[in-house]
């Protein structure tokens, strides 16, 4: 969004314009009275050389760059290599990672240089291209997060209204990039490169800035207000509402369109013979119970991960969004006395924007088992650890154990045919706790169901 642009020229640490620079009490700051080379050396020593805390900022940028680049590339590779991970949600996650890679490669280094040296070294052409790419990538991120929230909202809250497919997801991604590239064109038009020291403009690029040049005072205010609403506030509010409804459906109510058997009307077993085939039907129903509970747990994990991604995005972009509105719309920070503090706020806010790109792969690693396994495999390969055969054996053992587990579940319910044929569908939130003493659990235990298996089934 516009709040993250490099052209948001930071309030200078000790001045806000060339006139202020020349009007300082320090007589050395008048380039007309002293040798140009000596004057430039003074500027480098007093203003451009990184301060102590700026070295910490440089280290932070380097860490973010490495983590964001490697992490987001691994996300893309994981989905590309594994067909079972090519879900609708993962397609959008890959698109989000591509936007993060774009902003990390094209914009992060330039932002670091500008924040530290307060100088635009990259010429007029890149003055238009880099801020444009940065705003495009932010727009892509916002629209992608919105599409993810919308897709999950339909799938969980209104599954019969809209069927999401991989083809529709790919088409949506194409539309996201086209729309983002179009709506950010004004950003490239208004960017201009200028010098804060016109007297030295032909001799040095020091204190050259890349900033917006509008034809009047009203246009930038209108533009940045609309930009803040369209690329931050409005999407954030809609996504919060969507995830609130998703939370209610997944944690508080039954999911429409599913047949989650989480509580049954039962009666005590009767010593009468059961019709042939009723045992097989009971086994099938029990298998359906396990599948439905597993689906609900998987949806909860996915929703939890996406909620964390949204929360981190909102936190990382909030400071720079507020600072940008205060600066561009209300004209603050232009004549402030404590420029060092304002400068620190802007530089830290810029770093937070890029930290968001590095945070997403970390979130996937901790909250998604599939991504975590793929990350481990990728790092093992890069470190030269030959674990492919071991991974295949481990996966084979996992598959065998899963089949054995399913067989055990069915065999432990040979006499479940005594269960009533009438099944009550209700919310999983109404299920008694696994360690409780509800009648359903007691009856299962009487039928010989292991308590460990029952706890696993009823875990939420």
UniProtKB/Swiss-Prot annotation:
One of its GO terms (molecular function) is G protein-coupled receptor activity. The record marks 44 as: Important for responses to orexin. Pfam families: 7tm_1 (PF00001), Orexin_rec2 (PF03827). Residues 1-54, 111-127, 192-222, 327-342 are extracellular. Glycans are attached at residues 14, 22, 202. It is found in: Cell membrane. Signal peptide: none annotated. Expressed in the brain in the cerebral cortex, septal nuclei, hippocampus, medial thalamic groups, dorsal and median raphe nuclei, and many hypothalamic nuclei including the tuberomammillary nucleus, dorsomedial hypothalamus, paraventricular hypothalamic nucleus, and ventral premammillary nucleus. Not detected in the spleen, lung, liver, skeletal muscle, kidney and testis. Orexin receptor mRNA expression has also been reported in the adrenal gland, enteric nervous system, and pancreas. GO terms for biological process: cellular response to hormone stimulus; circadian sleep/wake cycle process; feeding behavior; G protein-coupled receptor signaling pathway; locomotion; neuropeptide signaling pathway; phospholipase C-activating G protein-coupled receptor signaling pathway; regulation of circadian sleep/wake cycle, wakefulness. It is a multi-pass membrane protein. SUPFAM superfamilies: Family A G protein-coupled receptor-like. InterPro entries: GPCR_Rhodpsn, GPCR_Rhodpsn_7TM, Orexin_rcpt, Orexin_rcpt_2. Belongs to the G-protein coupled receptor 1 family. The N-terminal region is required for orexin signaling. This is Orexin receptor type 2. It comes from Rattus norvegicus (Rat). The lineage of its organism: Eukaryota, Metazoa, Chordata, Craniata, Vertebrata. The gene is Hcrtr2.
């Amino acid at each position: 969004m516009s709040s993250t642009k490099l052209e948001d020229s930071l309030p200078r640490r000790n001045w806000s314009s060339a006139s202020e620079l020349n009007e300082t009490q320090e007589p050395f700051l008048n380039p007309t009275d002293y040798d140009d080379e000596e004057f430039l050396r003074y500027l480098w020593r007093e203003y451009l050389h990184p301060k102590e805390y700026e070295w910490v900022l440089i280290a932070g940028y380097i860490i973010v760059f490495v983590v964001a680049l490697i992490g987001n590339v691994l996300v893309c590779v994981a989905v590309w290599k594994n067909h079972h991970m090519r879900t609708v949600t993962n397609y959008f996650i890959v698109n989000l990672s591509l936007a993060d890679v774009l902003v990390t490669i094209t914009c992060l280094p330039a932002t670091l240089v500008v924040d530290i040296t307060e100088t635009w070294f990259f010429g007029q052409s890149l003055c238009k291209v880099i801020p444009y790419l940065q705003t495009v990538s932010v727009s892509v991120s916002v629209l992608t997060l919105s599409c993810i929230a919308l897709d999950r909202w339909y799938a969980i809250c209104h599954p019969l209204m809209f069927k999401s497919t991989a083809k529709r997801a790919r088409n949506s991604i194409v539309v996201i990039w086209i729309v983002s590239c179009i709506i950010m064109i004004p950003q490239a038009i208004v960017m201009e490169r200028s010098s804060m020291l016109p007297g030295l403009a032909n001799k040095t690029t020091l204190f050259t800035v890349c900033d917006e040049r509008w034809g009047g005072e009203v246009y930038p205010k209108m533009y940045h207000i609309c930009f803040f609403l369209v690329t931050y506030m409005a999407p954030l509010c809609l996504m919060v509402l969507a995830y609130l409804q998703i939370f209610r459906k997944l944690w508080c109510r039954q999911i429409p369109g599913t047949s989650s058997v989480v509580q049954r009307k039962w009666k005590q077993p009767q010593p009468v013979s059961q019709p042939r085939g009723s045992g097989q039907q009971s086994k099938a129903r029990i298998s359906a119970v396990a599948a439905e509970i597993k689906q609900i747990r998987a949806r909860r994990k996915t929703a939890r991960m996406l909620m964390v991604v949204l929360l981190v995005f909102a936190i990382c972009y909030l400071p720079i969004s507020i600072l940008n509105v205060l600066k561009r719309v209300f004209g603050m920070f232009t004549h402030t006395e404590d420029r060092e503090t304002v400068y620190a706020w802007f530089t830290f806010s810029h770093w937070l924007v890029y930290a968001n790109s590095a945070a997403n792969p970390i979130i996937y690693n901790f909250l998604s088992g599939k991504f975590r396994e793929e990350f481990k495999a990728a790092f093992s390969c890069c470190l030269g650890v030959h674990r492919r055969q071991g991974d295949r054996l481990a996966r084979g053992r996992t598959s065998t154990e899963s089949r054995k587990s399913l067989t055990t579940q069915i065999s432990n319910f040979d006499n479940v045919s005594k269960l009533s044929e009438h099944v009550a569908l209700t919310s999983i939130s109404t299920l008694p706790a696994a360690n409780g003493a509800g009648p359903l659990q007691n009856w299962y235990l009487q039928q010989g169901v292991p308590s460990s298996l029952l706890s696993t089934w009823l875990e939420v």
